[in-house]
Amino acid sequence: MPLLEARAVSKRFGGLTALNAVDFTLDEGHIASIIGPNGAGKTTFFNVFTGIYVPEEGTVTFRGSPVLGRRPDEITSLGICRTFQNIRLFPRMTAIENVLVGMHSRIPLSFWDVISRNDRWRGQERRQWDHGAELLEVAGLRDKGNELARNLPYGEQRRLELARALASDPALLLLDEPTAGMTQGEARSLMALLRRLVEERKLTLLLIEHNMRVVMEVSDRVTVLDYGEKIAEGRPADVQRDPRVIEAYLGRRRWTPGASAAAGERHA
């Protein structure tokens, strides 16, 4: 059984069809990427998976359970978490406080525990802070816990978002352009971290990514959307050679793993 499965998902906004009968499956322990020119429907697909949008047609299941109709917080509790294209940290909170926010769906405390601050609450608070420090270390931010999020360099803010997402203990992590704004060196370092998380923490990852070099190097499978339709899917090397993908991105020009995101943007 696939970890995540979408069948014939369609989403419309007035007269615009953002997704047109799209099928998608993702197996546990894999890294998959969804690519396509701007406006192809990639983020809309993520928003369907996470309960922000409800499609007009189709089904989505996670571990065999229906996802559609659930609130975003309920979907997070199922084990699906995401990051966004634009950084959404709390800038006036410290790094570790941002991570602690991500644990809210996993805190086994009653209302009385919280307002009375009893022994159960104090023990849970200690465990949360210890786990938050551990996640910062995993993300390469071991000594940054007490720094305000707004004072961190851009690449470290991206890593902090990842640590906060991990705080919800997800089985599936959806990352919307995780390397946006990063140098190639920062992007390679982040991808190495993601690979390690998949291997060590048994995570499953689904990426939206414009950096084709990253997509080709890290993905087990690639799905290509164009104008809301799936035009290709398969191993990275096979997708790279698909004439429909080359046409969608670069017209008749040759597409290489180093092709820039700007080339895709010209098609949008």
Question: PLM features: what roles do these ranges have?
Answer:
Residues M1-A268:
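Glycine-rich phosphate-binding loops of nucleotide-dependent enzymes
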